[in-house]
Amino acid sequence: MESVTLGVRKGAWTEEEDKLLKKCIEKYGEGKWHQVPLRSGLNRCRKSCRMRWLNYLRPNINRGNFTADEVDLIIRLHKLLGNRWSLIAGRLPGRTSNDVKNYWNTHLQKKLITYPRAQPIPKTQKTIVPKGTEAQPRAHPKSPPRPSPPSNNEILWWDNKTVSPQIDNIGIHWSIDGSIFEEPILGNLQSAGDSFLQQNQSDWSDIFLEDVNLWDLLGDD
């Protein structure tokens, strides 16, 4: 086996080798490629015999130009199967895997197909804080300001207002300088007070006179 392996012929096939391979396939059929070199008398490996038959010697091979339907089918099958040329060629009657691969590399890969590129993952931008500065806390929404308590001046002013209100109903008004100016109602009050004092004075005078007369009488006795 080692001597046979070392003596395997490589390179281009001759016409005589092609005839021997055709006769072997016509007699035994396709398959069992490991027996083809012995049955045909060829000094070739089984892979070389299989590729030579499928790509060049098979009688139903189509050597014409690829049609638009075939090109469209190749593109769709390549999206599904990738570079599995034997499977793609099996869907195209009369086309070999070698012809499909060559047509793809020559016409379609560079002109029609653009492989999608992986989208780069966007990097999260980091905020650079200069040295010596501290991160400021987030600004929270300010609550409405609370009313401040009244000052002492305001309290005194309000006390004065409550203690000495303006009495419009009885005719008393505060003047600009703080003094009170009187209206007729104050005059009436004053006259009433004067009459009251005069009456009291007369009463006390009568009592005094009565006391005097009484002492006089007592003195006379």
From Swiss-Prot:
Gene behind this protein: MYB1
Example GO molecular function: DNA binding
Record carries keyword Repeat: yes
UniProt cross-references to InterPro entries, sorted A to Z: Homeodomain-like_sf (IPR009057), Myb_dom (IPR017930), Myb_TF_plants (IPR015495), SANT/Myb (IPR001005)
Protein name, UniProt field: Transcription factor MYB1
Classification via CDD domains: SANT
Xref: PROSITE patterns: HTH_MYB (PS51294)
SMART domains noted in UniProt: SANT
Annotated keywords: Activator, DNA-binding, Nucleus, Repeat, Transcription, Transcription regulation
UniProt DNA-binding residue ranges: 33-57, 85-108
Top-level division of the source organism's lineage: Eukaryota
The keyword rRNA-binding is assigned to this record: no
